[in-house]
Amino acid sequence: MAQPSFFKQGPSSTLAEIAALTKAELVDASRADHRITGVASLDEAGPMHLGFFENIKYAGQLAQTRAGAVLVSPRFEASVPPHVAVLRAKSPFRAFVAYARLIHQDAMRPQSGFDLTGIAASAVIHPTARLEDGVTVDPLAVIGPQVEIGAGSVIGSGAVLSPGVRIGRDCNVGAGTVIQFALIGNNVLIHPGCQIGQDGYGFIFAETHQKVPQTGRVIIQNDVEIGAGTTIDRGSLRDTVIGEGSKIDNQVQIGHNVTIGRHCLIAAQCGLAGSLTLGDNVALGAKVGINNHLHIGDGAQVTAMSAVKDDVPANGRWGGYFAKPTKQWFREILAVERLPKSGAPGADSKDAKGERQG
């Protein structure tokens, strides 16, 4: 059985055309007319593929690659095998992505899972819902009362939009996603299985753990992307806000009243407790946990698997458990590693002949 290809192959390009597109320099001009039909990793590329090299860990793959051409920085140019055309680039990966985006435009955003345009017969749409022209609704999706959906948006199979939800233009709501009490801007990509706008985790910690009403909303601004399985709680009093251009990975939990600034990057399995604020351009590595009511300043970065219990200043580089400035954290790690491996108080030790002491 032939291996299926899930993405359409774009038109082929000559190396001269790729060089112009990526602002790279073709080192051997005699190869300008060689045609490239796709992109691939160095170890899987063939003569019609473009690859890139930027990480010294893959030097072995570069030495053995069968790629037709490789984007590479001047530093590693001499390591490219002679049968491979060299495209010299200041940032090889950035150049590679520019070409990949051109030939795989269908991979840039999800489309209807059923290759539909318009409304599937099995979709349930309340008569008071308002859908602009060009909206696609896949089978078994449910659109509730007073919902508004902008032109060009795609609602995936089995998605549920609860009463009053607003979806902007050119959005994609993935299959099985549930959205309630939320206002969503334009060009927002929500991958399958997300839960947006449910109750925040609010209780009075008495014997009966009385529930606190959660009467806020979720506001998602333009150009946000939300990964599969992510959950975003609505606010209790003020709104939960996801700022313009922020990109959230899979399986992230965002608590009630959280404010995330513009153009933030949040990797998988982060947990953001209620009422904390992230500034603009904040980056969180995978599995970062942040306590409630904290402020993470503009441009701050927190390394993966860190636990944050204090405010992080703007442009801070923090990490660890509990998180602190990375330079301090690294010094403490080195200090621990330099501690004696034996002879510490209370530890078993042996004399030079290997006999136990004490």
From Swiss-Prot:
Give the first-level EC class, as a single word.
Answer: transferase
How does this protein assemble? Homotrimer.
> Which pathway does the protein contribute to?
Bacterial outer membrane biogenesis; LPS lipid A biosynthesis
What family classification does the UniProt entry report for this protein?
Belongs to the transferase hexapeptide repeat family. LpxD subfamily.
Cite the SUPFAM superfamilies for this sequence: Trimeric LpxA-like enzymes
GO cellular component term, pick one = membrane
Q: Name one GO molecular function term.
A: N-acyltransferase activity
Matches recorded under InterPro entries: Hexapep, Hexapep_transf_CS, LpxD, Trimer_LpxA-like_sf, UDP_GlcNAc_AcTrfase_non-rep
Task: Give the species.
Answer: Rhodopseudomonas palustris (strain BisB18)
> What name goes with this protein?
UDP-3-O-acylglucosamine N-acyltransferase 1
Report the EC number(s), separated by commas if there are several. 2.3.1.191
Pfam families, per the entry: Hexapep (PF00132), LpxD (PF04613)
What's the domain of life for this entry?
Bacteria
The record's keywords, sorted A to Z, are:
Acyltransferase, Lipid A biosynthesis, Lipid biosynthesis, Lipid metabolism, Repeat, Transferase
Q: Does the keyword Acyltransferase apply?
A: yes
